[in-house]
């Protein structure tokens, strides 16, 4: 019976991921075919679809690398961070997951995210600021949250949408005017691929995997404080991966609002404290 429930849950999770992936790519397909049709009618629409297909193929192949490069992340070895590897191995074993690749971003802001096309190709990236800010229990909770995204099949639609947003907004570095048009399209791609509900689920599943909801709540408080002090500038590349992070890396104003996908901190803390048996 338990195996049947696990299988049903996995099928549902895969179906949900597929639906979010389709929703994420539709805006690009519509944009390319619409522009093509406006320029050259039916032939242009077909050409636009061909362009969209090429972009999707390239993005699918390199989406995780695009996301990691946006944060200047580099692979980290076990020699450099043996304790980080130990925690990830323990949590992966507890969650019956392959051990993900580990990366570090030089950002001083405390944050983290997971990318990949499936659990076997998953990677977790932590910022230098995260490792400097959290104690072991808090870091364990954050890593549990990221692994919950892996087990929940959230990675493929979220990572592909990050890659698509990076590709869509890249011309903005050359012509800021294009960003006025392409920025909302990239934001729509991201919003259709993720939901706040997935963050709540990752918080709960990650806290249970790590065994300490209070520690994850403490980590979120520190991360939010770090973001307030060291908010990143919402440039095109970073904006395209902001939805992957455990907390938004931006001040919630201006252009960054387009890419806001994270639930309110207060509600995340309330749910984690309820999970731990606390009452406010």
Set out the residue ranges of the language-model regions:
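Polar-ligand-bearing catalytic/cofactor-coordination segments
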Residues: 1-26, 46, 56-174, 186-280
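Hydrophobic core of alpha-helical transmembrane segments in multi-pass integral membrane proteins
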Residues: 27-34, 52-53
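Short, hydrophobic transmembrane alpha-helix segments
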Residues: 33-44
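Hydrophobic core segments of alpha-helical transmembrane domains in multi-pass membrane proteins
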Residues: 44-55, 178-184
């Amino acid at each position: 019976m338990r195996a049947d429930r696990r299988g049903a849950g996995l099928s549902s999770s895969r179906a949900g991921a597929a639906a979010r992936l389709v929703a994420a790519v539709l805006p690009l397909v519509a944009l390319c075919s619409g522009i093509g049709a406006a320029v050259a009618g039916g032939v242009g629409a077909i050409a636009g679809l061909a362009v969209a297909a090429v972009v999707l193929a390239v993005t699918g192949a390199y989406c995780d690398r695009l996301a990691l490069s946006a944060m200047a992340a580099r692979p980290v070895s076990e020699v450099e961070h043996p304790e980080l590897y130990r925690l990830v191995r323990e949590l992966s074993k507890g969650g019956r997951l392959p051990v993900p690749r580990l990366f570090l971003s030089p950002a001083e802001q405390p944050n983290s995210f997971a990318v990949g096309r499936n659990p076997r190709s998953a990677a977790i990236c932590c910022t230098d600021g995260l490792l400097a800010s959290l104690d072991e229990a808090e870091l364990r909770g954050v890593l549990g949250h990221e692994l919950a995204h892996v087990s929940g099949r959230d990675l493929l639609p979220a990572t592909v949408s990050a890659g698509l947003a990076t590709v869509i907004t890249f011309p903005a570095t050359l012509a800021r005017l294009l960003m006025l048009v392409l920025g909302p399209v990239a934001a729509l791609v991201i919003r259709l691929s993720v939901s706040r509900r997935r963050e709540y689920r990752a918080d709960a599943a990650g806290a249970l995997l790590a065994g300490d909801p209070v520690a994850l709540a403490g980590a979120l408080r520190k991360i939010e404080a770090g973001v307030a002090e060291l908010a990143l500038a919402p440039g095109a590349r970073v904006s395209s991966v902001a939805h992957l992070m455990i907390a938004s890396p931006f001040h919630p104003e201006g252009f960054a609002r387009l890419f806001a996908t994270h639930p309110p901190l207060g509600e995340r803390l309330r749910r984690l404290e309820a999970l731990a048996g606390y009452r406010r």
